[in-house]
From Swiss-Prot:
Entry-annotated residues carrying N5-methylglutamine: Q156
Keyword Zinc: no
Gene Ontology molecular function, alphabetical: rRNA binding; structural constituent of ribosome
Keywords: Methylation, Ribonucleoprotein, Ribosomal protein, RNA-binding, rRNA-binding
GO biological process, one term: translation
Native source species: Xylella fastidiosa (strain M12)
Disulfide bridge partners, by residue number: none
Name by which UniProt lists this protein: Large ribosomal subunit protein uL3
Originating gene: rplC
Subunit structure: Part of the 50S ribosomal subunit. Forms a cluster with proteins L14 and L19.
PROSITE patterns with a match to the protein in the record: RIBOSOMAL_L3
UniProt xrefs under HAMAP family: Ribosomal_uL3_B
InterPro entries: Ribosomal_uL3, Ribosomal_uL3_bac/org-type, Ribosomal_uL3_CS, Transl_B-barrel_sf
């Protein structure tokens, strides 16, 4: 079993830059980091694993179904825009209680973090954009196959396209993680955290921030 630690749910606000003391500027991503509310504490004795379930933000009551409404009411927590879980070590469970809040104090400037988000959806795309295929000749007798993928396989034997063949299809909107991003600045008053570099997804998308698993 790996080493688990508490994480944080934020929302990507956009990108900016920060000037260092020596005059250099570095690109940063700003993440809106309002307090996470603990909804449930899962234990290995009852649930088979140890985890902290949290929510963040708010949601109109008409958008909360009955099972979710009962779940939030049991915890006496305002309904948020979703539910997320973070696996933790059993020894960490005592640090949290249902209804309590998790803030930015779990992170520090200079710390390395892993960030997970949903990439931008690109819809249905061809092989050139989706898999970086090379285009066919623009002229020299080519009039129909400028962006064609090329051969899909053999003939009667094996008589099929092998699984995993790179073809056109839906691109983006998948879960992606970026590892070892440095925390550059934490603004507790504005509920913002700035990390070095880019993170997956569009502005406004939810992201999960965890302590780096590999350093």
């Amino acid at each position: 079993m790996g080493c688990y630690s508490m994480g944080f749910v934020g929302r990507k606000a956009g990108m900016s830059r920060v000037f260092l003391e020596d005059g250099r500027s570095i690109p940063v991503t700003l993440i809106e980091a309002t307090a996470n509310r603990v909804v449930q504490i899962k234990t290995s004795d009852v649930d088979g694993y140890d985890a902290i379930q949290v929510t963040v933000g708010s949601r109109r009551s008409v958008l909360v179904n009955k099972p979710e409404s009962g779940h939030f009411a049991k915890a006496k927590v305002e309904a948020g825009r979703g539910l997320w879980e973070f696996r933790v070590e059993k020894t960490q469970l005592g640090s949290y209680s249902v209804g309590s809040e998790v803030g930015l104090s779990i992170f520090a400037v200079g710390q390395k973090v892993d960030i997970q988000g949903i990439t931008k959806g690109k819809g249905f795309q061809g092989t050139i954009k989706r898999h970086n295929f090379r285009m066919g000749d623009a002229t020299h007798g080519n009039s129909l196959s400028h962006r064609a993928p090329g051969s899909l396989g053999q003939r009667q034997t094996p008589g099929r396209v092998f699984p995993g063949k790179k073809m056109s299809g839906h691109m983006g909107a998948v879960r992606q993680s970026v590892q070892n991003l440095e925390v550059i600045k934490i603004d507790v008053e504005r509920f913002l955290i700035a990390v070095r570099g880019a993170i997956p997804g569009a502005s406004g998308g939810d992201v999960l921030i965890r302590s780096a698993s590999k350093i």
